[in-house]
């Protein structure tokens, strides 16, 4: 039986006093890809921020257990060191910090956490060359400031490059398809698929079904008003694509 990577039970959370998550239940096992869909404002991105420990979001009930450990006891950087990775919908630009230095510092922080010797610049450059092929990135991007002047597709590929370097146990991709054309979407998706293995898990958050043509999920969940109200397979995403999110109003609000 596969190990449970993430177990969320009756999770409630708020931001600025407003309750956003209203009883989320979710279990993700090793080797699985899960997708969460839902209209804007349903709580999808809030869930990703709560899992990763964003300080603006307060857990008001329930629990998040990651590999047997209560996540509420960990600071955001501790969650990252424990193997949780978040690919942002809108990656930040950091002028003056080269992409290479950022990746090397992040990678060495993980090695230090694991009790391993840090890599010097030369050894790290050897390591990163093979990772660049995963997302088809030109090595010249390593010398540029982090995400500065990058196109939307380049920023998203850079997020997957970070994922390839850090080899997280749980990857959360928050609307990784946002703003991507078909070619960029294909490259990013191929990178995600390449990095999948029996020991890790991926949570894909998306608004549109088209991403799931490239990253094939094992389970699809639909969020509505802060809860997961439906779960299923690929057919559920196709049904949403055909009927639109308005059909959820009929399904969820229909009298019992």
Curated annotation (Swiss-Prot):
ATP binds at residues 38-45. Keywords: ATP-binding, Nucleotide-binding, Transport. InterPro entries: ABC_transporter-like_ATP-bd (IPR003439), ABC_transporter-like_CS (IPR017871), FeS-cluster_ATPase_SufC (IPR010230), P-loop_NTPase (IPR027417). It comes from the Bacteria. The keyword Heme does not apply. The keyword Cell division does not apply. SUPFAM superfamilies: P-loop containing nucleoside triphosphate hydrolases. One of its GO terms (molecular function) is ATP hydrolysis activity. Disulfide bonds: none annotated. Belongs to the ABC transporter superfamily. Ycf16 family. This is Probable ATP-dependent transporter slr0075.
């Amino acid at each position: 039986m596969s190990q449970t990577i993430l177990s969320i039970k009756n999770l409630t959370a708020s931001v600025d006093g407003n309750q956003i998550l209203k009883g989320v239940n979710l279990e993700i096992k090793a080797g699985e890809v899960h997708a969460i869909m839902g209209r804007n404002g349903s709580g999808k991105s809030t869930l990703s921020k709560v899992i990763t420990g964003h300080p603006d979001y307060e857990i008001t009930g329930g629990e998040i257990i990651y590999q047997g450990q209560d996540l509420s006891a960990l600071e955001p950087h501790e969650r990252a060191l424990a193997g949780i990775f978040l690919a942002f919908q809108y990656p930040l630009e950091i002028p003056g910090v080269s992409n290479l230095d950022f990746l090397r510092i992040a990678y060495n922080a993980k090695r230090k956490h694991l009790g391993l010797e840090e890599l010097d610049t030369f050894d790290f450059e050897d390591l990163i060359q093979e990772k660049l092929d995963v997302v088809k990135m030109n090595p010249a991007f390593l010398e540029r400031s982090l995400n500065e002047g990058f196109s939307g597709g380049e920023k998203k590929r850079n997020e997957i490059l970070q994922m390839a370097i850090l080899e997280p146990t749980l990857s959360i991709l928050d609307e990784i398809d946002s703003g991507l054309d078909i070619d960029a979407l294909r490259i990013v998706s191929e990178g995600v698929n390449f990095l999948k293995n029996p020991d890790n898990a991926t949570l894909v958050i998306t608004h549109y079904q088209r991403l799931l043509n490239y990253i094939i999920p094992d389970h699809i969940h639909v969020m509505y008003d802060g809860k997961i109200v439906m779960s299923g397979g690929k057919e559920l995403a196709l049904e949403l694509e055909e009927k639109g999110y308005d059909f959820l109003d009929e399904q969820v609000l229909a009298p019992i």
